[in-house]
């Protein structure tokens, strides 16, 4: 346990005093909340009796009276504590001792009171009785505002905010609004699908084969079955199995996991939505997608427009449609149509794009598009008709066998949706899988290394013409809430392990300080400078090396100790 601050020690002393007074600082009883800060303000009527509960966020004590702010799930309300209103008899200890001396900012309290308006027009609760519901032992990281209105000590450090999201939500109300909008997005999308008659389903998170995408999976082991299992990287192949089974429209909000890098737009655990509808194609899905996103934008923000950085995005349908070949030709002057792999590789080099021999034709085209085209699409734009090599699960284009019936939706230079006319020819699908294995063997890190034979068996029973679409929910809510980082739209993003201060002995600290000044010393000299006995010296040097603070090196000149 880390050392307690002075404030934390004082709060623990108050906790003990409360218990001495017979007050349970963490009561189990239900508290009969009848009102919220929002409902009080909306339905305000002078003299009305209310019962509210929340967190004490500020207070100004002036002798026998005190104004304070109470924060609940819907906002803040001013409350007024008056000693004689709370303590109507001779015993004034509830105000003088409990409220004034033993409560702190951050404590949860329940309040019974009457409504009134202050002289300056503030809607306020006159406290008639209060109950301590939970004692806070750690002070909140609240900002201070000085006489000039400048804010100090604001809780804005991103790493601290993500690690302590619970504190972030309390002291930064705008953060909570992001997650309220996130829930609105999920609800709006779910309603849209349900109204269309599609079924929400659940598919396995632990899978025997990591299929449906090319990504590095998290691997675990099932002890009872003695087999490896993979955390889901995508749910596509299971949803298609359900189309084979007779469902004509299925969707799932899935937690997916990819054991890859982290940056401003990628988290190892993320949320995707995938939907599959029988008897449709990618043209229908484009129409469906833009109607869906227009509906969601209005549900989240009340308008189809959303600010993102310096851009204003408009999700109002319809969206522009551009083929990948036309996009590359427009931005580079190079026409990829009917070009060989060697010609495309040479063109990429001429465009100063880093390529290597492991890249096949599809990967090369993807690199050109990513480097030269993708970032130019700010408003929602469909990029369509991808090369077959880039889309192993997608149906061959009806008029050009080199292409597939696929689109990606670009917004602000990023892909937020990916959709196909799904491949339902089991023989073609098997050949595509086998080709992917060959690409993976060449070193293509975006090619899949597994063949899902059970999925092929399902296709052999027959799958109707189907269109499917996946949407990155985290990225979509980033655009709808003007957040540049995925960490801002996840309650608890993945973080590196928190660095904790090492607890080492005083002797080890003293020796380490000596070592830091010199960086490297002969072991015998360091021991002599330390003045420690043989026993204490052995213990100290072991402690420093064990905690990776120092290392002992043997050289021709003797034993030396250095700082790690």
Describe the predicted segments one by one.
Residues 501-508, 522, 552-564:
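Short, cationic-aromatic polyanion-contact patches
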Residues 1-503, 550:
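Class II aminoacyl-tRNA synthetase catalytic cores and aaRS-like
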């Amino acid at each position: 346990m880390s050392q307690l601050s002075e404030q934390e020690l004082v709060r623990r002393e108050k906790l003990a005093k409360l218990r001495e007074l017979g007050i349970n600082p963490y009561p189990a009883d239900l508290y009969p909340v009848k009102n919220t800060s929002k409902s009080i303000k909306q339905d305000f009527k002078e003299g009305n009796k209310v019962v509210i509960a929340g967190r004490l966020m500020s207070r100004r004590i002036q002798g026998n009276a005190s104004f304070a702010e109470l924060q609940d799930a819907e906002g803040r309300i001013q409350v007024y504590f008056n000693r004689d209103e709370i303590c109507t008899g001779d015993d004034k200890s509830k105000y003088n001792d409990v409220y004034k001396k033993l409560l702190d900012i951050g404590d949860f309290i329940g309040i019974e009171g009457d409504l009134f308006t202050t002289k300056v027009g503030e809607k306020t609760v006159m406290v008639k009785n209060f109950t301590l519901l939970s004692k806070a032992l750690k002070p909140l990281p609240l900002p201070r505002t000085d006489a000039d209105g400048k804010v100090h000590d604001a809780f804005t450090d991103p790493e601290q905010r993500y690690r302590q999201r619970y504190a972030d939500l309390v002291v930064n109300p705008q953060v909570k609004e992001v997650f309220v909008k996130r829930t609105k997005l999920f609800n709006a999308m779910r309603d849209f699908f349900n109204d269309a008659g599609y079924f929400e389903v659940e598919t396995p998170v632990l899978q025997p084969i990591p299929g449906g995408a090319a990504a590095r999976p998290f691997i675990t082991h099932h002890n009872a079955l003695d087999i490896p299992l993979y955390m889901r990287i995508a749910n596509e192949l299971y949803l298609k199995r359900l189309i084979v089974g007779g469902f004509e429209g299925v969707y799932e909000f899935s937690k997916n996991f990819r054991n890859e890098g982290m940056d401003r737009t990628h988290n190892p655990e993320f949320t995707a939505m995938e939907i599959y509808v029988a008897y449709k194609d990618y043209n229908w899905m484009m129409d469906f997608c833009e109607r869906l996103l227009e509906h969601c934008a209005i549900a989240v923000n009340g308008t189809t427009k959303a600010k993102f950085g310096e851009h204003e995005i408009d999700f109002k349908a319809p969206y522009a449609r551009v083929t990948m070949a036309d996009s590359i030709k427009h931005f580079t002057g190079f026409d990829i149509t009917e070009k060989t792999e060697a010609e495309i590789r040479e063109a990429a080099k001429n465009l100063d794009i880093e390529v290597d021999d492991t890249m096949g034709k599809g990967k090369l085209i993807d690199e050109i598009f990513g480097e030269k085209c993708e970032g130019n699409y700010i408003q929602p734009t469909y990029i369509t008709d991808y090369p077959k090599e880039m889309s192993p699960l997608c149906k061959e284009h009806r008029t050009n066998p080199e292409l597939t019936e696929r689109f990606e939706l670009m917004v602000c230079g990023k892909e937020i949706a990916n959709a196909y006319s799904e491949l339902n020819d089991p023989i073609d699908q098997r050949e595509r899988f086998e080709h992917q294995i060959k690409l993976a063997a060449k070193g293509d890190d975006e090619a899949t290394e597994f063949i899902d034979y059970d999925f092929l068996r399902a296709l052999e029973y027959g799958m109707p013409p189907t269109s499917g679409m996946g949407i990155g929910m985290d990225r979509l809510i980033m655009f709808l809430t003007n957040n540049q980082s995925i960490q801002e739209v996840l309650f608890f993003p993945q973080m590196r392990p928190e660095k904790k201060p090492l607890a080492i002995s005083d002797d080890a600290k003293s020796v380490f300080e000596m070592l830091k000044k010199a960086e490297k010393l002969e072991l015998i000299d360091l021991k002599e400078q330390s003045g420690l006995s043989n026993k204490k010296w052995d213990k100290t040097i072991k402690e420093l090396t064990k905690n990776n603070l120092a290392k002992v090196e043997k050289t021709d000149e003797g034993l030396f100790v250095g700082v790690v």
